[in-house]
Amino acid sequence: MDTFAALKSLSLAYGPPGREKEVRGLFKGYVNGLVDEVFEDTSGNLIVKRYGQHKGTVFFSAHMDEVCFLVSKVLPEGFLRLEGIGADVKLLPSQKVWIHTRSGKRLRGVIGMLAPHLQTEETRKKLNGFEDLFVDVSMSDFSEISVGDFVTYDNEPFSTGDFFFGKSLDDRACGVIIVKMLERLTALRHDFDVFAAFSSREEIGAFGARTAAYALQPDIGIALDVTHAIDTSPNYPKNEFGKGPVIAVGAIPHRKISNLLIETAKQNGIPYQIEPSPSRTGTDTDQIQLETVAAGVVSLPLRYMHTPYEQICVKDIDETARLLALFVSALKEGVV
């Protein structure tokens, strides 16, 4: 797999919660020849299976959906109002966006607001809310745009050195990790069967991962998601670029799974980081563990989460894939 090319295609793909078809098609192509089964379930997950020696099952999940917006109102003046799904309203003025109509057309627009010259002193000090913003699509006929149409960022991803910038790296970059793990497993013996879900609708509650875990009933489940790469603030865990995967420890991650991930990293010289997780993880794991699965979380450091330009380090993708492939090959019957 050409990691940078895959990241670019995935970043550009359209995939709000429940509308992941384009992303699903990309991942279906990436896993071709690496798995024994691949299918789409009724929740919109892409499920893949690679069989080992049937001594147990380990399940990985990485979500395909992205933060986005919905058209909430079409104004008589010819502008659109929005509601957000996971987006930070402070970042939105002047952002280019795509409006995805029900007929399948894409229309370009720009998020605007009242110019500073026209604002009062009070409104200039006020943080923007969605009620202060609108989408200008410069059209006189709005008949093709409907309330409920999805709106996504329109921006061009790019790379510099080992770093990649673009939208929707949360969590499609972790889908790339699954693919690269599967590539490595072609050269490794593994007793456990490997199931994976490129999951749907995580940004609104991780519903896809829950239905997949319920249907597959694995022994072990690991969510792959992004976490905050914070290099400067002493008030947060110091997750850094280029220092490898981040392994969660805490209330929800199963202790045996976290410990085995850590031991696998140590034994194979893989750099890793630890992140405390005192309550819910905010990942697919919160739903996977509800199905009585021994669950863990492995995260990819990322800056600028839920913005038009998220940032990751590709070295961390490679090290995480290496860790997970060796973790799978180390699993033995009765490990949990």
PLM features: residue spans?
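N-terminal hydrophobic/helix-forming segments and targeting peptides
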Residues: 1-336
